[in-house]
């Protein structure tokens, strides 16, 4: 899927908004891609996940043991990436301000993890979620994101596939 085709998916879902937006990172933007809205259609979410999965090198796709995403925004795209890759998908959540594994989710020692987000701006939530995964024994091999709001400047310490 080309960038234009991805934007067409956002437009079709009325999820490409124009105006003035204050982002959760504190930054301002003239445009806002509402990922929750574009992902509410399961067929569209599946197409976008397949396109995102296709950006990963084949050897990376084959090495992944588990997809992990931070709640809330990453849950749907993380699940769909798991489906696209044929891998299990779980999420970490922040009930008290720091990410943790809950709901009986576990990570096997040394498991190769693909972190998946809906949107990355500063990368802070990704890095915090990665700390939780590493503390549980996982090895983050890459991150994929539906939207890169950093303009290509974010450094997550692992290969990044927006």
Name the predicted role of every residue range.
Residues 1-116, 120-162:
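PRPP-associated nucleotide enzymes
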